[in-house]
Design a protein with these regions (language model features):
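Beta-rich carbohydrate-recognition and catalytic domains
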Residues: 1-164, 168-218
Length: 219
């Protein structure tokens, strides 16, 4: 756990002592110890327990400074909060760990997510990064050769707001879909990719292209 995550955990425990006394605080549906959460990410069953990750700001009740929170459960009702799985790598100009997915690759828990920073903005600079977990999924280490995918993978096709990978395996190959849009005119789209090892990816084609009437992006 990095220094930022340790600071976040201490802060959460302090705030949780206060918020759990709120009579209007939900008690049945999952929620973090305190502060902001949004998208659930990478739910999976691993070694007899359900794991859930989620977009999380451990320092404020507003969106921002996005980490990956992490919890596990045996019954999907009672949850144990685990240390923050992913924190932004400030030293690598990363300010947010956006949504993604978690899979098991040859026994190794593996997260693939969208990395955002000052020089890689959501519209035209997002990258896809990887992190590897230990056997208990309590500690995560970002892959030393990140990014594993950049916008250059599209070989001249202009893709914007490219984000939120979903990963699955069919036969010998891994596949990924990411959302975004094609500009000029804006057309929301889903893009398809293929890999034999999760590290090296090939862009196949736009899987879905919709009209602007459908919105700006598909996430």
């Amino acid at each position: 756990m990095g220094n930022l995550s340790k600071k976040a955990l201490e802060n959460l425990k302090e705030i949780n002592f206060k918020v759990k006394k709120d009579p209007q605080r939900p008690v049945y549906h999952f929620l973090p110890l305190a502060f902001w959460m949004n998208d659930p990410n990478g739910p999976l069953l691993y070694q007899g327990e359900y794991h859930l990750f989620y977009q999380f700001n451990p320092f404020d009740d507003k969106w921002g400074n996005i980490h990956w929170g992490h919890a596990k459960s045996k019954d999907l009702v009672h949850w144990e909060h685990l240390p923050v799985a992913l924190e932004p790598s400030k030293e690598k100009n990363e300010t947010h760990c956006f949504s993604g997915d978690c899979v098991i690759n040859e026994g190794t828990p593996t997260i693939i997510y969208t990395s955002i920073g000052p020089n890689k903005l959501p519209k035209d600079g997002a990258e896809q990064w990887m992190a590897l977990g230990d056997n208990g999924m309590a500690n995560w280490t970002k892959f030393g050769e990140n990014p594993i995918m950049t916008l250059d993978i599209h070989e001249g096709l202009n893709v914007e707001d490219w984000r939120d990978p979903f990963i699955w395996k069919e036969g010998e190959y891994w596949y990924a879909v990411l959302g975004g849009h094609l500009p000029k005119p804006i057309r929301p789209a889903v893009f398809l990719y293929k890999s034999d090892d999760l590290y090296n990816w090939q862009f196949l084609n736009p899987l879905i292209i919709k009209s602007r009437k459908s919105g700006k992006n598909i996430k």
